[in-house]
Amino acid sequence: MTTVEVPHGSRSVILTVSAVVEETADTRSIVFAVPDELRDKFAYRPGQFLTLRIPSDRTGSVARCYSLASSPFTDDAPKVTVKRTSDGYGSNWLCDNIATGQTLEVLPPAGVFTPKSLDHDFLLFGAGSGITPVISILKSALTQGGGKVVLVYANRDEKSVIFAEELRALAEKYPTRLTVVHWLESVQGLPTADQLAAIAAPYESYEAFMCGPGPFMDTVHQALNTVGMPRARVHAEVFNSLSGDPFADQAPVEVSDEDAADAATVEVELDGEVHKLSWPRKQTLVDIMLAKGIDVPYSCQEGECGSCACTVLEGKVEMENCDVLDPEDIEAGYILGCQARPVTDHLKIEF
């Protein structure tokens, strides 16, 4: 049995695996037992993810992000779902080795792929394991909202459909609110933008969320653009491989008297509270908020996960790495707090 007893950093915790579910031949769901004293720390929103520290003989460990397939409104415990990939060390290790009773080091929930309100009509797209955060949103919207939900779910073949029985049961439970459209490559081939546009056309007024391989999401973007859905209502989840160690505590950036004198000022709104801060130009937004003891959302601190995404309302920043953001996101004012440094003297930012 693999066990972990001591956290690697101050933010992570050790959780026990309470169940492992074989969803398909190459997919496992991992359910975690969260002690009462950690309930608040591991409260999450539909569509978020957990970062797991996975043992490795080569490097000691690797960090991987996996979406929560559970809903905070319908499931008693958080559950991530992992699909084996041919070249994925983390997914292969988990599918081959993880078992009930083992422990893993885990960072608290993070991510911005989550609806601001569940009381909308939703058009959801998932491909393969991209269904994982999507089904969390789907279940949450059905139980907490009053709108309709349409899911377009693409897979290689019928055997590779994750959560097939759960989706069937939900469709029976909510016959007037939930529509599930399955797309099987073995039967229909890969979906084209025109084909997806034809499916999406009646739902142009809905909120769209998508997750899946890059080519699939590119096709969905084209389809939604064709039907005229505003970019502000289109949300995509993108995962990049983590190059750094999000579990390690970061050393504070030293600020000289000269740097402090030249600092910008920023008003940051987080969870309805406004913080007025001095922002030295060598420090990132996450740096200064952590230094002030503010519980800012973040994970990798490498600009690779999007956990710290926020919006600039006034002012301008520069970012070293922002590949996880689409050009449309940047144009809309989205930034990454772990990469953002001030350019202008005064800024307003909202999480």
Curated annotation (Swiss-Prot):
Q: Which pH dependence is annotated?
A: Optimum pH is 7.
Signal peptide bounds: none
Q: In which pathway does it act?
A: Steroid metabolism; cholesterol degradation
Q: What is the free-text note on the cofactor?
A: Binds 1 FAD per subunit. Binds 1 2Fe-2S cluster.
Pfam families on file: FAD_binding_6, Fer2, NAD_binding_1
Which key words are in the record?
2Fe-2S, Cholesterol metabolism, FAD, Flavoprotein, Iron, Iron-sulfur, Lipid degradation, Lipid metabolism, Metal-binding, Oxidoreductase, Steroid metabolism, Sterol metabolism
> What temperature notes does the entry carry?
Optimum temperature is 33 degrees Celsius.
Domain FAD-binding FR-type intervals? 10-116
- Cite the EC number: 1.14.15.30
Q: Which GO terms describe its biological process?
A: cholesterol catabolic process
InterPro entries, per the entry: 2Fe-2S_ferredoxin-like_sf, 2Fe-2S_ferredoxin-type, 2Fe2S_fd_BS, Beta-grasp_dom_sf, Cbr1-like_FAD-bd_dom, FAD-bd_FR_type, Flavoprot_Pyr_Nucl_cyt_Rdtase, FNR_nucleotide-bd
Q: Under which main EC class is this enzyme filed?
A: oxidoreductase
How is the enzymatic or functional activity of this protein modulated? KSH activity is completely inhibited by zinc ions. KshB is specifically inhibited by Cu(2+) ions.
Q: State where [2Fe-2S] cluster binds.
A: 300, 305, 308, 338
Cofactor(s) listed in the protein's UniProt record:
FAD; [2Fe-2S] cluster
Start and end of every 2Fe-2S ferredoxin-type domain?
A: 264-351
Q: Name one GO molecular function term.
A: 3-ketosteroid 9-alpha-monooxygenase activity
Catalysed reaction(s) here are: androsta-1,4-diene-3,17-dione + 2 reduced [2Fe-2S]-[ferredoxin] + O2 + 2 H(+) = 9alpha-hydroxyandrosta-1,4-diene-3,17-dione + 2 oxidized [2Fe-2S]-[ferredoxin] + H2O
Function, as annotated: Probably involved in the degradation of cholesterol. In vitro, catalyzes the introduction of a 9alpha-hydroxyl moiety into the ring B of 3-ketosteroid substrates such as 1,4-androstadiene-3,17-dione (ADD), 4-androstene-3,17-dione (AD), 4-androstene-17beta-ol-3-one (testosterone), 4-pregnene-3,20-dione (progesterone), 19-nor-4-androstene-3,17-dione (nordion), 1-(5alpha)-androstene-3,17-dione, 5alpha-androstane-3,17-dione and 5beta-androstane-3,17-dione. KSH has the highest activity with 3-keto-Delta4 steroid substrates.
This protein's assembly is summarised as: The two-component system 3-ketosteroid-9-alpha-monooxygenase is composed of an oxygenase component KshA and a reductase component KshB.
This chain belongs to the protein called 3-ketosteroid-9-alpha-monooxygenase, ferredoxin reductase component
